[in-house]
């Protein structure tokens, strides 16, 4: 039996995160491109990869009661296969249990884990049988940690900050589906033309409820395979990023400094507000991110944007009091975008301690421009 390509792509993306410390969005993007997956296959692979990353703690607890050893003691690849199977059983109603189990068994065989194929079959069948049995928890923190798949340290932090009721709502919201929002590149096309092009390729398109020239889209896991993407007719952008440009309201001919610009979305939105006229200086500390921004600007036909390697904490005296608009999307914990980047929840909370000082230094410096 041939292994399903979409499930295999999800497994490869999860393995890249585990081995290389990659983020799931970037890892998945590379795998989909490598394997030439698009449309429903890409969407299915994305659902599984994001879902397993998002629900890992819950899945491991469900697997643990069907194993004779702790899940983390298993070979990592085998554990990922079990997680993929369990995710489909618990959280993908449209996937038949037999299909989820059989595909997991075939993946184990394909990766030379033949001896484990029987284990995969037995464990996932047992997982299905025990679906209706409640899990046991030591206290309310553990219950919330497992039920929402957030590390206990993060649960305790959020309860301390928000109180139990609001923290639970916050953590559960992290697991809600993420709408994909795109902005029409008004430098190249119109919202009407963009929508028609997307619908011609069977993408489901809905106007954004309160942002002009923006849409929410679904029905494809690989936006970069679309004609409209190749033509530079749109960019993927959260509503919050678009609102930043609208609030700043740069005019045609403005000089804008974007101090922490990568991956470039806010700079792109500013360029569209400015009708492509003026000068946007988009800065970042990592050279490979500059190349990504340059490629994005080229695809979108943005010629008023200059990228520069720069530390936002260090003032360029030549720019003092020269800017009409300064944008500072300072480095942050990312806890507010876990819904979009589920792997952030597994960050070590201690690593966040130095962020306020960095943020303050960047803002102090930017105020001089």
For the regions a language model picked out, list residue spans one by one.
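S-adenosylmethionine
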Residues: 1-369
């Amino acid at each position: 039996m041939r292994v399903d390509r979409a499930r295999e792509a999800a497994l490869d993306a999860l393995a890249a995160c585990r081995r290389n410390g990659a983020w799931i969005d970037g890892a998945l993007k590379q795998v989909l491109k490598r394997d030439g997956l698009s449309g429903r296959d890409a969407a299915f692979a994305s659902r599984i990869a994001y879902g397993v990353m998002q629900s890992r703690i819950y899945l491991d607890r469900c697997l643990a009661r069907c194993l004779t050893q702790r899940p983390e003691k298993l070979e990592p690849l085998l554990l990922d296969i079990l997680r993929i199977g369990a995710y489909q059983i618990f959280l993908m109603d449209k996937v038949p249990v037999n299909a989820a189990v059989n595909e997991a068994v075939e993946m184990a065989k394909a990766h030379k884990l033949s001896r484990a194929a029987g284990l995969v079959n037995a464990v996932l069948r047992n997982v299905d049988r025990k679906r209706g049995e409640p899990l046991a928890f030591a206290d309310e923190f553990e219950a919330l940690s497992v039920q929402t798949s957030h590390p206990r340290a993060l649960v305790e932090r959020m309860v301390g900050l928000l109180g139990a009721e609001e923290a639970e709502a916050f953590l559960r919201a992290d697991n809600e589906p993420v709408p994909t929002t795109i902005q029409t590149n008004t430098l190249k096309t119109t919202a009407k033309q963009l929508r028609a092009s997307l619908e011609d390729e069977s993408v489901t398109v809905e106007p954004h409820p309160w942002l002009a020239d923006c849409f929410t889209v679904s029905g494809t896991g690989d936006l970069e395979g679309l004609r409209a993407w190749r033509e530079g007719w749109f960019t993927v952008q959260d509503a919050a990023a678009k609102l930043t440009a609208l609030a700043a309201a740069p005019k045609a001919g403005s000089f804008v400094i974007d101090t922490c610009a990568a991956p470039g979305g806010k700079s792109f939105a500013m360029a569209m507000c400015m009708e492509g006229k003026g000068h946007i200086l988009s800065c970042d500390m990592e050279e490979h991110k500059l190349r990504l921004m340059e490629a994005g600007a080229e695809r979108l036909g943005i010629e008023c944007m200059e990228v520069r390697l720069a530390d936002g904490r260090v003032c360029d005296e030549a720019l003092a009091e020269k800017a009409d608009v300064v944008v500072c999307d300072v480095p942050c914990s990312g806890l507010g975008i876990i819904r979009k980047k589920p792997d952030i929840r597994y960050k070590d909370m201690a690593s966040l301690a130095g962020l306020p000082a960095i943020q303050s230094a960047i803002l102090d410096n930017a105020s001089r421009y």
